[in-house]
Amino acid sequence: MNWTEVAIVANHEVSPIITNLLEDYGSNGVVIEDSEDLTHDFEDKYGEIYALNAEDYPTQGVRVKAYFNEIKYTKDFQEKLIQSLKDIESLDLDLFSFDEQTIREQDWENEWKHYFHPFRASEKFTIVPSWETYQQEDDSELCIELDPGMAFGTGDHPTTSMCLKAIEAYVKSSDSVIDVGTGSGILSIAAHLLGVKRIKALDVDEMAVRVAKENFQKNNCEYAIEAVPGNLLKEETEKFDVVIANILAHIIEEMIDDAYNTLNKDGYFITSGIIEEKHEAIVEHMKRSGFEIVSINHDNSWVCIVGQKVSD
């Protein structure tokens, strides 16, 4: 089966909205090429970034690439997608462009690797592609070896970075953790590296569960993490000290009450995948459910919210 790569150039302000929209349309992977990446003063360990070819990046704004299988990507699908993009209120139509190309199956399987290099995702965590050799800087650095596949994030998205920082801040080695929508398994691995002994990783997508298990093996923690298919927290009967969910805002909205009921007293709900425009509604829902909001962090139009269950 072949794949269609769509490439959308747009202004920075709408890139999170476009990413959300593409995921809602069922994209199997999203790549963001930001014109500002060529001007940032990165630290030495990001040295790979200087080898980037400026011709591969837009001169202005961002290029968002998404991948759809050829069976799904019909003419009607394409027209609806383009119209949905043009309906974005703050889209700069003068900058906007939409292109597409067909990618063969064997090329698609390796396309995403061009964008994935070792990088420091938070104070403690460094993400390392499984096919690259990386020298740990010091004993405090915690390396997560990752082979996410095209369908799952490489950990460089702002929502993942914010979740990793929240895990550093709020997760203790004595806690129990449930990771909802685990994807590549990166957040479960992070919890394990902090010494957490009881971790459960859920995903409604069985392929995600398989990929997560493979990454758990790469990080020598398959014995410590229970990875199973699961539809949010609807059927969860166990209690946990921390619930983590880095998924889309409308899905988070569905699970807030269940997250509260799944937590032990004083437990934390760490959640991201939320665009700026939707975070206030999420915060208000969390408060109504009984959460005390302990932190709200923003990064490039994305938001990470941490709530605490302060009473039973």
From Swiss-Prot:
Catalytic reaction annotation: L-lysyl-[protein] + 3 S-adenosyl-L-methionine = N(6),N(6),N(6)-trimethyl-L-lysyl-[protein] + 3 S-adenosyl-L-homocysteine + 3 H(+)
Compartments in which it is found: Cytoplasm
EC number: 2.1.1.-
Gene Ontology process terms (BP): methylation
Database matches in InterPro entries: Ribosomal_L11_MeTrfase_PrmA (IPR050078), Ribosomal_PrmA_MeTrfase (IPR004498), SAM-dependent_MTases_sf (IPR029063)
SUPFAM superfamilies assigned: S-adenosyl-L-methionine-dependent methyltransferases
Keyword field: Cytoplasm, Methyltransferase, S-adenosyl-L-methionine, Transferase
Domain of life where this protein originates: Bacteria
Major site of localization recorded for this protein: cytoplasm
Ranges in a coiled coil: none
GO MF: protein-lysine N-methyltransferase activity
Keyword flag Methyltransferase: yes
Binding site for S-adenosyl-L-methionine: 160, 181, 203, 246
Pfam families: PrmA (PF06325)
GO CC term, one of those recorded: cytoplasm
Similarity-based family: Belongs to the methyltransferase superfamily. PrmA family.
Function: Methylates ribosomal protein L11.
Entry protein name: Ribosomal protein L11 methyltransferase
Species assigned in the record: Staphylococcus saprophyticus subsp. saprophyticus (strain ATCC 15305 / DSM 20229 / NCIMB 8711 / NCTC 7292 / S-41)
